[in-house]
Amino acid sequence: MSLPIAEILLAGPRGFCAGVERAIDIVELALSVCQPPVYVRKEIVHNRYVVEALRAKGAIFVDELTEVPDDATVIFSAHGISPEVRVEATRRGLRVIDATCPLVTKVHLEAIRYARENYSIVLIGHADHDEVIGTLGEAPDRIHVIAGAEEVERLRVPDPEKIAYLTQTTLSVDDTRDVIDALRRRFPRIVGPSRDDICYATQNRQAAVKRLASDVEVLLIIGAANSSNANRLVEVAQMAGTRAYLINDVRDIRPEWLAGAHRVGVTVGASTPEVLVSQTVEALAGRGVAVREVHVVEEDVRFALPQELDEIAGERGVPLPSRTAMHQSL
């Protein structure tokens, strides 16, 4: 791909968040300490490259528990599950390892608390996203899912004085702020979490895109079409007035997108491995093209592994391998 690009700017931070790293590590560690086969309900994270890499190592991905044999080991994806799924797994005698992101679990616990206190709950998010489906299952009779500020006026709740809001963790910070503002105007006594439900990684990656957007003519976001956080990065860039395109990998790049662009930005969604960044830079960078990192914040978040993995390893007398190189192997 020979193009007159003078400089490639890489957003920082980018790529795997702590929840994704943990989920991938869980699958790899389970494959090393459990008796095969190891099943994973849904995509462990929303990235085809990651899923195919783990499938090649022996993970079996299924859509529903009906595809998992009785007494087998099953891993729940990073996006979380509804209580009904957990109950079904217990009834079937499945050995469960829960890879739900701790920040998603936090939203589930908030939903449970508000429901017990008889609040109507507004969940800001996309109704068809796995994370929202799981959270909705915690209190289906009390949760109302909305995606935009224009839906606020259509909300009907039993007691406007007893209402709370929660958010999907991977939304656009700006769009969510607009929805929350609309909710507060209509329901002045609405309550919400003590801290924003939108995860640190989502906020940091969107801030990095905003910073990069002002310095480039085109921004390429590498991520899956079903990745909420990757799609939000495209929207953030476009709202900043920059041409932005979502690609699965370098093969999706169209030369006409880059016509006349001297500075091109590259970033990836929170479920996308760094190897795809390297491949994209290699394809774009001709002789003499400078590559520069643009950092807005450093990250040092790391989540502990679920207790179930330690228990399984202990039962089998197998020490858990180090996590250091697990997700880096993709």
Regions found by a protein language model. Give the residues of each.
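The feature marks the mature, well-folded catalytic cores of soluble enzymes
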Residues: 1-268, 274-330
